[in-house]
Design a protein with these regions (language model features):
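An N-terminal boundary/leader segment
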Residues: 1-86, 317-320, 324-327, 374, ...
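Gly/Ser-rich catalytic/binding loops embedded in alpha/beta enzyme cores
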Residues: 31-211, 229
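Flexible glycine/proline-enriched surface loops and loop-helix/loop-strand junctions
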Residues: 43, 123-125, 177-182, 189, ...
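Sec-exported extracytoplasmic/periplasmic mature domains
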Residues: 45-52, 63-71, 81-84, 88-96, ...
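Short helix-loop capping/hinge segments that flank enzyme active sites or metal/cofactor-binding pockets
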Residues: 104-123, 288-299, 348-413, 453, ...
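Glycine-rich, small-residue loops and helix-cap segments
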Residues: 105, 145, 149, 202, ...
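A short helix-breaking turn/cap at a secondary-structure junction
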Residues: 227-313, 489-495
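Acidic-enriched catalytic cores of C-N bond-cleaving enzymes acting on peptides and small amides
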Residues: 253-278, 303-337, 355-375
Length: 496
């Protein structure tokens, strides 16, 4: 049930062998080999210069790469049939002297929780297939208004991991594989977004996170992933899990490209947004680390007891790079907040929000969590239980008023675990080894974090550093992460 391609034949229009082959007019300049790993700026320069390749050519090149490589990776769940037509129109705009912005003509990928007009939005679940979105999520419109091209939707851990299945597996898309090694952990739930960017199937992707769903797969697949402050970006039109933690976020192969994408994603405000007018690329300067006070945990306190934290040899190298670039390193203690009530609160949120979303979404075969569970039972068979977490969610009961009070108390406690050392030591940011699971507390707090490649393990798999800070500290985090990335030069490409 959990093997590659499981269930794909059920809906053959979205299996790889049936992805639409779109006709393309002759392209004057072929897209050269290696372009799949070019930065956004490099792609834009090529498309802007006389004799350079076109956006249409780039889309065609990446579509062919998807058809060649993705049957093994299972990172893409559906190609956008309008991508080439959109590329042609944007090429014409460029020829007429109209360039919408840095993302003009740049292909992007969207996680399959993000509503995209004319395409399925299923969170990887067959139960949510059959009614293409009638309009874009506002976030998608923001990106399109900046000239981005939706190339495809990406596979993911089904229902953002709340079905209880392995990371990267969905009934609709099969098992996403880590491009660095097919048996390595791919992470979740934005598995396909991270794997596809790492494999050079697109330069940019949008993931979404409740807890770890951007940070974890980005780290494990060796790309940059930013989990923004909750409320910074518009969440309308994205299949929800928890209003207290949900946020979309950009994924790319460099911090600069993540910053470019964040600019486009926060281009407009909504009732949900806490955004401020800022160009996130302006602070990405060569000496960004000089004088920055960066805390790193050497101890942690749990249940009132202080314990030593053993950092990896790779993390020690990360600290050496930061110090060599002029950062002031400050050893700190991190308090571990009490998370004993977290699961009950989260599952109650998921039940309320998923039921609300399904009830409003038109044309789906299921209209509630109960119907979704029944759909899966009828399809998979009652004797094979592949949805233990869904049943647990559906059985959860919490009074809404007491739940909100408990959430507020929990969030404040988790925020203080980050705020206290930053205030005490006058820190600009905190850095930790990704393996310390620091992303969990950052997610509960609703605070931002960014993961950056830091090297490889003895087995050649990516390692990562995790930078995080207080609410709306994205400009500082991006600057620090960029400075580290440029000095470390630790990103690696998979051998495909």
């Amino acid at each position: 049930m959990f093997g590659i391609g499981a269930g794909v034949s059920f809906f053959v229009n979205y299996s790889h062998k049936n992805l639409p082959v779109q006709s393309s007019p002759a392209i004057s300049t072929p897209v050269p080999a290696g372009t799949e790993y070019a930065s956004v700026r490099e792609l834009a320069e090529q498309m802007s210069r006389p004799g350079g390749f076109t956006s249409e050519g780039l889309v065609t090149y990446l579509q062919e790469r998807i058809r060649t490589l993705d049957p093994q990776l299972r990172s893409v769940i559906e190609l956008n049939p309008q991508a080439l037509e959109t590329a042609r129109a944007l090429d014409q705009e460029r020829a007429n002297g109209q360039v919408r912005g840095p993302l003009h003509g740049i292909p992007i990928l969207l996680k399959d929780t993000i509503e995209t007009q004319g395409m399925q939005t299923s969170a990887g679940a067959f139960a949510l297939v059959g009614a293409p979105a009638g309009k874009n999520a506002p976030l998608v419109d923001y990106l399109i208004s900046q000239g981005a091209i939706v190339l495809a939707k990406t596979n993911m851990t089904e229902l953002a991991g709340f079905r209880g299945t392995p990371d990267g597996w969905s009934s609709r898309g099969g098992q996403t594989r880590n491009p660095h090694h097919p048996d390595a952990d791919v992470g979740g739930s934005s598995s396909g977004s991270a794997a596809a960017v790492a494999a050079g199937l697109a330069p940019l992707a949008v993931g979404a996170e409740t807890n770890g769903s951007i940070i974890v797969p980005a780290a494990l697949n060796g790309v940059v992933g930013l989990k923004p402050s909750v409320g910074l970006l518009d969440r309308d039109g994205i299949i929800p899990a928890s209003q207290h933690q949900d946020t979309p976020g950009p994924m790319a192969r460099s911090v600069f490209d993540v910053a470019l994408m964040l600019n486009a994603m926060s281009a407009r405000k909504s009732h949900d947004s806490a955004s401020v007018e800022v160009d996130y690329t302006k602070l990405l300067v060569p000496d960004a680390l000089k004088g920055k006070r960066i805390g790193y945990p050497v101890t942690f306190t749990a249940n009132g007891e202080v314990q030593a934290l053993e950092n990896s040899a790779q993390f020690s190298k990360t600290l050496e790079v930061l110090e060599a670039q002029g950062a002031v390193l400050v050893p700190i203690n991190l308090r571990i907040a009490d998370a004993s009530g977290y699961e009950k609160l989260l599952l109650s949120d998921v039940k309320e929000e998923l039921n609300g979303y399904l009830a409003k979404r038109t044309g789906l075969p299921v209209k509630s969590l109960t119907e979704l569970i029944k759909f899966n039972e009828d399809r998979d068979g009652k004797d094979t239980d592949h949805q233990p977490d869904l049943k647990k969610i559906n059985d959860s009961t919490l009074d809404p008023a007491s739940r909100e009070t408990a959430w507020n108390e929990l969030i404040q406690d988790f925020r203080s675990t980050v705020d206290e050392p930053i205030k005490t030591h006058t820190l600009d940011a905190i850095v930790s080894d990704f393996d310390t699971n620091s992303y969990f507390g950052v997610a509960v707090a609703g605070y931002p974090g960014i993961t950056v490649p830091s090297g490889t393990t003895e087995d050649g798999l990516p390692t990562a550093a995790h930078f995080f800070g207080t609410r709306l500290s994205e400009p500082t985090l991006l600057a620090v992460a960029h400075g580290y990335e440029q000095a470390a030069q630790a990103a690696t490409k998979p051998e495909l």
